[in-house]
Amino acid sequence: PQTIRGIPGDKIFFVQLADAPKIDMDLFYWSRHFRNMPGEGDLPVVEFMRAVAATGYDGPLSLEIFNDQFRGGSPVEIARDGHRSLIGLMDDVRRNEPDIRLPIPDIPPRAHCHGVEFIEFTTSEEEAADLAALLAVMGFTHAGNHVSKQVAHWRQNDINILINTEESGFAHSAYQAHGASVCDIALRVDDAARTVERARMLGAETVTTPTGDGELSIPAIRGVGGGMMRFI
């Protein structure tokens, strides 16, 4: 990187990027089959781009990714992943090299996660009894029910499990699509609103769910696999 910093920025006309996991194998095979987006591997891509940005370079960034999964994947999803990775990469660069010329969106900083607040299962009334029995065997106790919905709260120390047997809404739709499964995960963060805003600017789909009397409005995004990821 220090050598790159000595190059005049106007002498660099194009930058191609790729990341990859560190795997001990033939270099050519590794390069052709295991590349991934910046930030998804083990290579010092941030350090490399910090050096490039420090030269005053303000030209295009290109992704050159050879990967067996990408070849058979959805072009739209791959393009979104690539866009997200570039925005995230350059946000990291800007925070370490503030005097750069590359145009970068001003997004909130990375969130600090303090833990999992709860995990919510969607299931039917019949299957809920079996799940509750399993939780009881594992040492969980029934801590209460939702004020207006068919949701039971099970707890063991700081671990919170919710069993949702609603017959409408997102949880029920998830049950119809996947059967008994995790539909919702909530994480404790420093600032839920800014966490969701960062996710939105990185391409995540924000989700607003209807709330009734006495219910909290918890910021959320659509997670991997279509589930809900909430922030508290």
Where are these regions (language model features)?
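Acidic/histidine-rich catalytic cores of soluble enzymes
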Residues: P1-D42
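Conserved, mostly hydrophobic/aromatic
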Residues: V15-L17, P38, V52, L61, ...
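Vicinal oxygen chelate
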Residues: M37, N96-I100, P105-P109, H114-E125, H153-T165, H172-I232
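C-terminal helical cap(s) of enzyme catalytic domains, especially alpha/beta-barrels
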Residues: G72-R95
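Short, structured motif recognition centered on aromatic/hydrophobic residues
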Residues: C113-F121, L135, F140, W154, ...
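Amphipathic alpha-helical segments
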Residues: E125-T141, R198-L202
